[in-house]
Amino acid sequence: ASHVLEEMSYDNAVDILNELSKPKVASLLTLMNKDKANEIKALLHYEEDTAGGIMTTEFISLKSTTPVKEALIHVKEQAPDAETIYVIFAVNEDEQLVGVLSLRDLIVAENDAYIEDVMSERVISANVGDDQEDIAQLMRDYDFIAVPVVDYQNHLLGIITIDDILDVMDEEASEDYSRLAGVSDIDSTSDSMFKTASKRLPWLIVLTFLGMITATILGSFEDTLSQVALLAAFIPIISGMSGNSGTQSLAVSVRNISTGEINEQSKFKIALREAGSGLLSGIVCAVILFLIIVVIFRQPLLALIVGGSLTCAMTVGTLVGSMIPLVMNKCKIDPAVASGPFITTINDIVSML
C-alpha cells in the first residue's frame, strides 16, 4: 500500500489517508520515501474541507526575475511531476506570490524577456484556511483550471486544480441533497440499520412535534368539519399543494444561494416574485378545483371556499419556501438544513389555518 501511495499525487494520497485510522496512517508513512512522507504529513495537518486539505504541492513556480529561456528549461524538467503545467505561478525571493502566466504566454514570449515582463500581476488566490465550497465557487466564477493557495503572508503553499474541485462540488451536492431530504448525514450502503436510523431520527422527531401542531389545529375545527364533512376530503389537496409549491421555491432558493446569485438588494425582489408566482399558480389550480367541485358535487359555495383556501395556501407556501433558506443563510446556518420535509410540515400548519 505504501508503494501505491508513493506513486500517487500528494493530494490524492492525503484523501485516502484521511479515511484511515491514525495508527494505520502512521505505519504507512514510515514505510514511504522520507521526502514524500514529509510532504504528505504537512498536508495532513490541514482540515479536510479547507483549501489546505485539498491542495497539492506538486506545481510549477518560477522566480519573477527568471529569464524566459531558463524558465522553459525549468518547466520541461518539472513537468513530469507537476499536477498541471498549463498555469505557472511567479514568486519573489521570499516565495511570495506575485504573478501568474499560462504556458502559452511563456512559449510565445521573447527568449530575452523575463517572467515579470510576461506575467499578470492580477492574481486571484485562496487562503489556506478557506472553505472548499468557497474555492469551488471562486473557480466556477472565474473559469479557472487551477487556483494558487497562500498563507496569511502571501507565501505560495500549493495549488488546487479543477479535478479536485469537481470532487468537492459532487461532495457538496450530495450533502445538500441529503439535508434537503431531512437526513443529518449522507447514508452509506455499508451503514447498519441502527446508524442509518440515527442519522434520520433527529429531523423525524422534530417533524413529529410539528405534526402535532397540525393535528391540534385540525382538531379545533372539529365542529365545522362535522357540519360540512365533504370539506375534510379536500384538506389533503390543500396541504399537499402548499407543500409542493413550497418545496419547488425552496429548491430554487437554495440553488441561488449556493451559486451566489442572491444578494441583499435582490432579496425583496425575490420575495415579491415568489409570492406573485405562488398567487398565480394558486389561482390556476383553484379555478381547476373549483370547476371539478361544481361539476361533480354541485356545491358552488364549497368550491369557492376550497378554491380560496388553495390560493392562499399556495401563495404563503411558496413565499415560506423561498424565504426560510434566505433567513437561515443570513443567520450563518446552512440553508440546505431547511429540508423538504421541514418546509412541507410548516406549510401543512399554514394550510390548516
Cite the ranges covered by each PLM segment.
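Hydrophobic packing positions in regular secondary-structure scaffolds
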Residues: 1-180
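Broad hydrophobic/π-residue packing in well-ordered secondary structure
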Residues: 46, 59, 87-89, 107, ...
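Alpha-helical transmembrane segments and their membrane-interface boundaries
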Residues: 169-319, 323-337, 341, 345-346
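Hydrophobic alpha-helical transmembrane segments in multi-pass integral membrane proteins
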Residues: 346-353
